[in-house]
């Protein structure tokens, strides 16, 4: 079994969520009572990973601070006997989990962001989790499915894994995957035969499958990333490096189990907020009544 480290690229500027993200990192936008990045870290930890590397930017100090210990806050909560809140704050970074930071000096793309993590990862396999795609943990147990299942399959086969989902409609803003066999049920795996970042003419691909922002990558991806030239949007794309790797060895796509929300865009963020709000143990019932009242007006 391989002990993998996870990379979370958080250096992006959150353009789709402006003006909210002008001064607040998109990863710190709340989904009810936790910032988006917390759901991502919780998923990674549930999959068994203990070392997490945040690739950050000078404007992302709030993300780094979120996972740091706030002695003043913890002391205040203890003095006021706010035990539940204190426990929640202390669980932000679980015991035994190490969260490190490295800076991406220039916005040169996701592939470049991953390369910035190489000194900390070394020439080893690793996991990449994009911070703006939240997988609903009530729709799929994170201890068993999706990232956890990808890691298990990687440990079994040694092949790189990409999580995928069906997305009928316009795929021009996404990473589109074509597989050898149809991904016709949750959890099914098939070899990737084509992988394109934000295709100009997605209708020319016989596929409605897109990447969901979860990758388990063998060490063979490093030379491909080093050779990758700027692609879509003038950026070094991880997708392009994986596509080259898939020409040389088997790279698997796994169809996601459950639901996900693209919280880097307004519609996905609103959907996630409502979904998590409705099942919030403390305020969910009131929230539901409030929404029902608004819809009836």
Curated annotation (Swiss-Prot):
Swiss-Prot/TrEMBL catalytic activity: alpha-D-glucose 1-phosphate + UTP + H(+) = UDP-alpha-D-glucose + diphosphate
EC number assigned by the record: 2.7.7.9
Keywords: Lipopolysaccharide biosynthesis, Nucleotidyltransferase, Transferase
GO terms for biological process, alphabetical: lipopolysaccharide biosynthetic process; UDP-alpha-D-glucose metabolic process
Highest taxon, organism lineage: Bacteria
A molecular function GO annotation: enzyme regulator activity
EC class (word): transferase
Family annotation (SUPFAM superfamilies): Nucleotide-diphospho-sugar transferases
Pathway per the UniProt entry: Carbohydrate metabolism; nucleotide-sugar metabolism; Bacterial outer membrane biogenesis; lipopolysaccharide biosynthesis
Family classification: Belongs to the UDPGP type 2 family.
Protein name: UTP--glucose-1-phosphate uridylyltransferase
UniProt gene name: galF
């Amino acid at each position: 079994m391989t002990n993998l480290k996870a990379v979370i690229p958080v250096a992006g500027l959150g353009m789709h969520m402006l003006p909210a993200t002008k001064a607040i990192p998109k990863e710190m936008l709340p989904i009810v009572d936790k910032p988006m990045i917390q759901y991502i870290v919780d998923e990674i930890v549930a999959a068994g990973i203990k070392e997490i590397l945040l690739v950050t930017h000078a404007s992302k100090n709030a993300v780094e601070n979120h996972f740091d210990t706030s002695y003043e806050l913890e002391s205040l909560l203890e003095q006021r006997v706010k035990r539940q809140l204190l426990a929640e704050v202390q669980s932000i970074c679980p015991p035994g989990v190490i969260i490190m930071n490295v800076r991406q000096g220039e916005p040169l793309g996701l592939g470049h962001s991953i390369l910035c993590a190489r000194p900390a990862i070394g020439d080893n396999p690793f996991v990449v989790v994009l911070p703006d795609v939240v997988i609903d943990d009530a729709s799929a147990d994170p201890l068993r499915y999706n990232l956890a299942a990808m890691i298990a399959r990687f440990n079994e086969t040694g092949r790189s894994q990409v999580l995928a989902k069906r997305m009928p409609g316009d795929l021009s803003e996404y990473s589109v995957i074509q597989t050898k066999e149809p991904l016709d049920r949750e959890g099914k795996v098939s070899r990737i035969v084509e992988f394109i970042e934000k295709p100009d003419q997605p209708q020319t691909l016989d596929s409605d499958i897109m990447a969901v922002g979860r990758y388990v990558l063998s060490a063979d991806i490093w030379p491909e990333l080093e050779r990758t030239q700027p692609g879509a949007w003038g950026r070094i794309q991880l997708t392009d490096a994986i596509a080259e790797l898939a020409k040389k060895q088997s790279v698997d796509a796994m169809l996601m189990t459950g639901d996900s929300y693209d919280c880097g865009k307004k519609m996905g963020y609103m959907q996630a907020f409502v979904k998590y709000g409705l099942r919030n143990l403390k305020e969910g019932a009131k929230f539901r009544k409030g929404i029902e009242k608004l819809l009836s007006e």
